[in-house]
Amino acid sequence: MNTMLFFCFSSKDRHSIVESILFHLTNYGLPVWYDRHKMLLGDERDNKNFDEGVKACNYSIIILSANTIASECANEEIDLIYQRYKQHKMYVFPIFFNIKASQLPEKYCWMKRLVYKELTVANDSRSACNHIICKVTLDELQKYKIKTINEYLKLYKNNKAFSYLTELIDSYCKISDENHNAQIALLYAGCLYIKEKYNCCLEIPEFYYKGIKRLFEETRLNLPIDLRETLIFERLFLLLFNAAIFGYTI
C-alpha cells in the first residue's frame, strides 16, 4: 500500500479550514486523497470514496466539526475509518474544528483517546500539519536501514565514499539546538549533494524532496522555524539518503 492520506470533512468547512490544511500538506508533496482532485461528476461515489479512497489509504485526517457531525456522507466515511483504525490498518489524525473535545457526542469520543488538535479559524493550521508530516516521515523511515543521524555516523563516519556528507553531518550536530536556520542550511546542502550525485528523484515519492525546498525557502526569507520543522528536515534528509544509496522501498 502506498503512503496516502484520506481527507474526511464536511464540504461546508472546505474554505474555512480544509483547503488551508491541504495547502500545507501538498507543499510537502504528501499524497492526499481529496474529493475535488479524485472524483468527477457521474462517478460511483461508494466505489471512489470508500474503495479507492478510505480502503486504499493508510492515514486519515478527520476534520470534525458541527458540520461534519451533521453530514451523512462524512459519517459514512468516519464509520469506515473507525473500522480500519480498530483493525490497525489506518492511523488517524483528529482535528476538532470550532468544537471542543468535551463537546463531542458519544459516537466520536474514541478520537479523544488519540492525540488531537483543536483549531479555530484564528489558529494557524501549519502546526497541525507539521505533526502529520512528522508522523508520516517517521513511519516512512522504518522501511530503511538508516533511521537516525546517529545511526548514519556510526556506520559511515570513517567511510571515505561519504566523507563530504559526514563532514556536513558532524557540523550539523555541533550547532546549537536553538539555531534552526543554520541546521537547515547544512541539511539543505547535504540534500542538494545527494540529488546531484545520485540523480535519484525520478524514482522516489515527491514528498521525499519537495518539503526540502519549501523549508529552505522559509529560512531564506527569515521566517520562524521551530524544532518540529528541523526534525522534519532531518528525516527528509535521511529518506533521501536511504533511497539514493539503498534504493526506494515501497
Task: Give a label for each model feature.
Residues 1-59, 82-83, 90, 171-250:
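Conserved N-terminal substructure of TIR/SEFIR domains
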Residues 22-141:
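Cross-kingdom TIR/SEFIR domain
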Residues 120-123, 127, 156-163, 181-185, ...:
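Alpha-helix boundary/N-cap detector
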Residues 17, 86-97, 118, 144-160:
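A short, terminal or domain-edge coil/loop segment
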Residues 131-170:
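Charged, amphipathic alpha-helical linkers/stalks
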